[in-house]
A protein has these predicted regions:
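Chalcogenol-based redox active-site neighborhoods
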Residues: 6-162
Length: 162
């Protein structure tokens, strides 16, 4: 199977990491315990699916914040690309650069993909919902962009009530 969903981390402490962020600092996952974290991995800045996904999460930010949540986007694009993407789309959340694909691999968001009959290694669109205790609550892998952000936010609302 080309898509290896990382179920080994489901209901376990989310793997910690530090990555360069568009907020001009390193994002350290361990410093955000106490928040519900929507951590989403996307293939590339300024592509149609990735732009739609980012804008959809951005539109839902008020609801996400109301439910003690934050959104963090991760791809292997560099920070310069992320800054342009963030500015162009007026994104109000941070994007992280994983140029060495270490975090992408850790979360199984890097793997074998197929397109037009060709196989290659790339980013598998994946979203991880991490609860306030730093535990991986839900994983969406090989995400279809349409209505995805809404689905994630519905799950966020459920865990915020518990």
């Amino acid at each position: 199977i080309p898509y290896q969903i990382n179920m080994t981390i489901l209901n376990k402490k989310a793997p910690t990491f530090k990555l360069p962020s568009t907020d001009n600092d390193n994002f350290d996952l361990s410093k955000h315990v106490g928040k519900n974290i929507i951590l989403y991995f996307y293939p590339r800045d300024n592509t149609s699916g990735c732009t739609t996904e980012a804008i959809d999460f951005n539109k839902l930010l008020p609801v996400i914040k109301k439910n003690n949540g934050i959104v963090i986007g991760v791809s292997k694009d560099n920070l310069e690309s992320h800054m342009k993407f963030k500015t162009k789309n007026k994104l109000k959340f941070d994007l992280l650069s994983d140029e060495n694909i270490k975090v992408l691999k850790k979360y199984k968001a890097w793997g074998l993909k197929k397109f037009l009959g060709k196989e290659y290694m790339g980013i598998i669109r994946t979203t991880i919902l991490i609860n306030t205790k730093g535990v991986t609550h839900k994983i969406w892998s090989n995400v279809r962009v349409k209505d995805h952000a809404k689905e994630v936010v519905e799950e966020l609302k459920k865990i915020n009530k518990t």
